[in-house]
């Protein structure tokens, strides 16, 4: 009875129970795919010994890795939701394109999430240069990048406007950062180690800046970004100047709807370009007004100061003879002394270098702004000239209207006299039958009306109501 025969059917409750149990096992297997159990044999053999339990001397073998299906591999290979195209370029010119989301950028550059919103499409028309602890956020027109002391992350590097900036980065940065002032590579990328002495463990700021006061990596990137933006502005202004000259000359010759529409388009483009130039100029002016903000932009100095702190901590930890409290106090004193020396030696020079850099491009942007304003003044002068022409034509129309009004008055007087004699009234003039009085009368009234018109025209000219 306990065994199941091939031809015998099970009761409905037994089949339902077996079906439900198999369904539960299937659901549990779907819920826990990693917990695989060995398949039990149909007839267990009592002679097969059970495996011994794992002990400390015989650890359990590791579980085999899970096999990934091709569909799962395809899902992993796809880019994440919200990921955007970035280009990474380090100080040695090594570049690569990456698809990174906001979380990866935040972890990589140490930025707050609100700074990434500045690089989004909502703030694409704004211009800003923000200094953070480990990075600098640059949003200048079409250039949106995150710059650290060692690399730059450029957003949307394949757009038409950004390609010249990418070419300048790849051509200039390796040449400027390849050799420092002492003839050695400027970075520690090859794993070189310093000596164990305290003087060699602490990085020196003059080694990173170079003997010829070469700009650090972040300032080189900022310089190239400002140069690219200013070059773009200069090209746009030159194009507007070439467009403005023939359009305005044509407008002075012929005031038509087509020419007025061309001038309106030119003026709107000029106003838009002036707004973009003004935003970048105001941002640079804001940085020049605050030395503290300019000092925060020096990311290389911050990195070297952090390396100083790590070197001092390692030197204090290696000194096992001195008690813990004394080592910490010495560590704090050494840190304060090194930071104060580094700040006093390099803060003024670094701010001065950045100030000179920003002032140069501020003057260039100011010159571009003056060129735009000169074109706008040219347009305004042309509009004033056109308005004068239109006023002159309007005055001529008014003079013509006045002349026609005076002539209409004389004709109306003559018509009134003729209409008065056309009425059925008693008059001695009707008794003259030979008609000798008709023509002198008509000629006299017409001459009188003409004289009235002449007198009115002379009076209008005397009052300067009519032109010469």
Curated annotation (Swiss-Prot):
Annotated region described as Disordered, given as residue ranges: 1-76, 183-204
Membrane topology annotation: Multi-pass membrane protein
InterPro entries assigned: MRS2-like (IPR039204)
UniProt entry tagged with the keyword Transmembrane helix: yes
Single biological process term from Gene Ontology: magnesium ion transport
Gene Ontology molecular function terms on file: magnesium ion transmembrane transporter activity
Record keyword Transmembrane helix present: yes
Transmembrane segments: 402-422, 437-457
Keywords: Ion transport, Magnesium, Membrane, Transmembrane, Transmembrane helix, Transport
Subcellular location: Membrane
Record's subunit section: Interacts with CYCB2-2.
Role noted for this protein: Putative magnesium transporter.
Similarity-based family: Belongs to the CorA metal ion transporter (MIT) (TC 1.A.35.5) family.
Stated name of the protein: Putative magnesium transporter MRS2-G
Originating species: Oryza sativa subsp. japonica
Taxonomic placement: Eukaryota, Viridiplantae, Streptophyta, Embryophyta, Tracheophyta
